[in-house]
Curated annotation (Swiss-Prot):
One of its GO terms (molecular function) is zinc ion binding. It comes from Rickettsia rickettsii (strain Sheila Smith). InterPro entries: DnaJ, DnaJ_C, DnaJ_domain, DnaJ_domain_CS, HSP40/DnaJ_pept-bd, HSP_DnaJ_Cys-rich_dom, HSP_DnaJ_Cys-rich_dom_sf, J_dom_sf. GO terms for biological process: chaperone cofactor-dependent protein refolding; DNA replication; protein refolding; response to heat. A zinc finger (CR-type) spans 136-214. Its cofactor is Zn(2+). Pfam families: DnaJ, DnaJ_C, DnaJ_CXXCXGXG. Residues 4-68 form the J domain. Belongs to the DnaJ family. Its main location: cytoplasm. This is Chaperone protein DnaJ. Keywords: Chaperone, Cytoplasm, DNA replication, Metal-binding, Repeat, Stress response, Zinc, Zinc-finger.
């Protein structure tokens, strides 16, 4: 009586996939024709590959356990599937370095496309204003995408019809052809690599399990988002083919330039015009802030044009943090162009008082030099 596949690999029927692979690699290395001169090495090597080819595949293994060794082999020979004892792909774990060097450092996989294909990822460009970036916001976006067919529920088959397993490849979606020591794996010609046959395709999706439509999706933009941030929405991309997993949606954020503020990380910069009187005497003025409303800013006496005053924690919010940046005000001292008679008289008095400072002496020229240094 011939050995069954579990006996060939020396494992129990409850062996895990990890145990199967470990046993296979050990035996394949032991009986590979290039590593031993034993007379029966080639025969054992083929038997080891045939056993692992079936047991590593959950569907094949289940069928093997259900039918038994002899009945399963008969079905395989009728269906045309199976490895038939050639090189199994996992043999690369043993001889990978050798083949990589021999083939110029490249080993390419020729595995066929499976029946279920993951949907494509999508990208959406979303423009928001600075206030929305500060507070965070829910935005509704519209885009075209492939969605799961609601008639066949992604199977690709007309409602009520069953999908049959391809008898040419036993549902694997691939056939193997032996050429010397190498096994070439290619997509099954009968099912085009799907592993099953759809005899009556769904009319709505034409057997693809999905179709295109306009979608409306609400996306959450967190407070403190920065320009150029990419937000991933898992599973909101295109639906997969024939029940495959959906891709992801990536929302790329662009923040529109603001009329008042310039953004520098979490800090905000703005120009603040003040009168020359406030600059000279100092005082309190109200300035607008990004969250809305105004706050009081102290102007020190003698403030010069171009001075920078900081409002702590009045900048942008930081994503996933309670910390805020600062707002930096750049002072612009405004000189009045049209003076009333009384204003001119007061300035003339101020000018006379200032003569004592002797602006035409050496200190005046030193001040001029400092402005250019």
């Amino acid at each position: 009586m011939s050995q069954n596949y579990y006996q060939i690999l020396g494992v129990s029927k409850t062996a895990s996939q990890a145990d199967l692979k470990k046993a296979y690699l050990k035996l394949a290395k032991q009986y590979h024709p290039d590593t031993t001169d034993a007379k029966d090495a080639e025969k054992k090597f083929k038997a080891i590959n045939a056993a692992y080819d079936v047991l590593k595949d959950e569907q094949k293994r289940a069928a093997y356990d259900r039918l038994g060794h002899d009945a399963f082999q008969n079905q395989q020979s009728r269906g045309g599937g199976g490895n038939h004892g050639g090189f199994h792909p996992d043999i690369n774990d043993i001889f990978g370095d050798f083949f990589s060097d021999f083939m110029g450092g490249s080993r390419r996989s020729s595995r066929p496309t499976s029946a279920k294909v993951r949907g494509s990822d999508l990208k959406y460009n979303l423009t928001i204003n600075l206030e929305e970036a500060f507070h965070g916001i829910e935005k509704n976006i519209n885009f075209s995408s492939a969605v799961k067919c609601n008639t066949c529920h992604g199977s690709g088959s007309e409602k009520g019809e069953t999908v049959t397993t391809c008898d040419a490849c036993s549902g694997v979606g691939a056939t193997r052809m032996q050429q010397g020591f190498f096994t070439i794996e290619q997509a099954c010609h009968k099912c085009q690599g799907n592993g099953h046959i759809i005899k009556n395709p769904c009319k709505k999706c034409h057997g693809m399990g999905r179709y295109h439509k306009q979608r409306n999706l609400s996306v959450n933009i967190p407070a403190g988002v920065e320009n150029g941030t990419r937000i991933r929405h898992t599973g909101e991309g295109e639906a997969g083919i024939r029940g495959g997993n959906s891709g992801d949606l990536y929302v790329d954020i662009t923040i529109k330039p603001h009329d008042i503020y310039k953004v520098d990380g979490a800090n905000l910069h703005c120009k603040l015009p003040i009168s020359f009187v406030n600059a000279a005497l100092g005082g309190e003025i109200e300035v607008p802030v990004i969250e809305g409303g105004k706050v009081s800013l102290t102007i020190p006496a003698g403030t010069q044009n171009g001075d920078q005053l900081r409002l702590r924690s009045k900048g942008m919010s930081k994503m996933r943090s309670t910390i805020r940046g600062d707002m930096l005000t750049h002072i612009h001292v405004e000189v009045p162009k049209n003076l009333s008679k009384r204003q001119r008289e007061l300035l003339e008095e101020f000018k006379k008082e200032s003569i004592n400072e002797k602006e035409n002496d050496g200190s005046f020229f030193n001040k001029m030099k400092s402005l250019w240094s």
